[in-house]
C-alpha cells in the first residue's frame, strides 16, 4: 500500500493523506481521541472524532495502546501548536497490530532499565530526534569531503600493530596469529593519501578503556582524513571549515529535532565565528588561572559554576517536592497525572546531573590550580578551558612526550609536536585530534623505540618515508562526541543506536 510520509505533510495541507505508523502517545476526551503518530520520518497528531468516524472506527481508535501500529486516512491541517506543525483529522482508521504492556511508559525509568531496553527506547521522541541529527551529521561529513575532492577509503579493522600503544587494545586471534581490533585507521590513511592525495576513512574504532565516564565508548565511529602536501596550519584551517559546515547542516535541516530535545541553538550558531587558536603553553596558563580571558579567571568561573549548581539543586528539590505533593492529591485527571509525572521525571534527571556537577566541580578546581605543564589534558582540564570560550578551541604545539609517535616534531624546537586538539565549547572537551605527521625517518624510528613498539610491525609504515615522503597532515573526529556536543547530551551513550561501553555489551 502506498502511503505518504509524516515528514512530507507540509506538501499536503488541505488534502487527504494515507499514513501508516505507531502510536507514540494518546489521550482522549468526550468523543475525541488524540493520537501522536510516528512513522520514522516525523511525528504528527491524528484526531479521531466519533461524529466523523462512526462508533465502530472510533472505538477502534480508542482501543489503540502505546506502540500499536495503525493505518489512517485524513485531511492535513496546518497547526503550529501541534508537534511537527500539522494535524491530521481522520476519516478512516484501521488497527494493524495491537501492542500490549509496552515496558517504557511515561513514568520515570532509571538509566539501567532504559539501556536494558535500548531496542525499544530508540522509539522514544528524544532518541528519534538524536538519531536523526546523527544521520544529518554523517551525510554532511561525506558531503563535505566529497565536494572537496577527497576519496573515501577503508582501513582494516584487524591489525597486527598498535597505532597509539597497546594498553587499550582488544586482542583477538587471527588464524593463529595475535591481532587487534583497530584503534585508528590513521596509519593506513597515510599510505592511502600517498596514493590518492586526499582521502578520508569513516569506520568503527575500538578502545578497551575501563572507563565509565560520560565521554567514553568501547566501540565508536571515527572520521579520519589524511592529506598529502599539507602542513599544520592548513590542517587546522580544514578542521575549522569542516566543523562549521557539518554543524550548519544540522541547524538547517534539524530544527524540529533540536526543539524536541530542547537544545538551545545559539551556542551552535557561534560556529560561524573564527575558532580560538592557542598554543599549549598559553592553555596551561589559562587552566591554572594565571591568564585571564576577557577579564575572567578560569578558577573564578568554576567557583561561580559551583555556586549556581548549588542554587539549582535547592530549586530542583523544591520543585520535586511540589510535584510529588500534586500527584498525591485525589481527583487528578489522567492527563494531569501524565503531565506531572513527565515533569517530575525531568526534574529528577536535572537533579542527578546537578548533584554530579556538585561532586565534580571542587575536584576540577583543585586539579586546574595545580596542573603541571608538560602533562596531557584530562577531561576536567578540557572542561575548564572550554568554559571561557563560546567557540571551539584549537590547542596546538604540544609537548612531544604526550603525543603519538607519528606526530611531527618542530624542527626549530624539538620539545614541541605539531599537533592540534579541538575542544568543543559548553564543557564538552576534545572532539578532534590531529596534526602534521613526522617525515624525519630517524626521529620516527627513535619514537617507535621510545614508545616500546615492535619495529618489525612498522617497517611498512617507515616505507612511506623512504619512498616519496612529503609533508602531510590529518585528523580524527569521534562521531559520537560530535553528536553529544551538537545535541548537548549529558552522556555519550545516547549518541549511538546500541552503545558498547565498559560493563555493557547488550542488547
Predicted features, each with a name:
Residues 1-507:
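Class II aminoacyl-tRNA synthetase catalytic cores and aaRS-like
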